[in-house]
Curated annotation (Swiss-Prot):
This is Large ribosomal subunit protein uL11. Forms part of the ribosomal stalk which helps the ribosome interact with GTP-bound translation factors. CDD domains: Ribosomal_L11 (cd00349). SUPFAM superfamilies: Ribosomal L11/L12e N-terminal domain, Ribosomal protein L11, C-terminal domain. The keyword Ribosomal protein applies. One or more lysine residues are methylated. It comes from Rhodococcus opacus (strain B4). It comes from the Bacteria.
Amino acid sequence: MPPKKKKLAGLIKLQIQAGQANPAPPVGPALGQHGVNIMEFCKAYNAATESQRGNVVPVEISVYEDRTFDFKLKTPPAAKLLLKAAGVQKGSGEPHKTKVASVTMDQVREIAKTKQEDLNANDIEQAAKIIAGTARSMGITVDG
């Protein structure tokens, strides 16, 4: 007989600094209410994201009824990557009136390559259009 599939008890989505997960909020309370071993998750997450330090890395944690878990790392949010490329701290409060910075189309394509697996796009050009739209909504102009 094949082994039984684990039954999913919950799905938790978090955005945590790479290599810096600790039991303090927001990680501790989110995992604690599902009965997951918090330190075990923190050690596994920190080891998996060590190479991406400095970025916020979203994670999707699947918690099973026997309190075991596994997690899937996503790519950093497009907004964070755009802010880093533009060299600014935050986007514009009124993006259609006040522009805070500009990025080149090459930078947008580079971000699109990074984000491709998480975007709903068939090729790099479509992904670049999605990223350019995000940039415009943040008050960042796209040159080129």
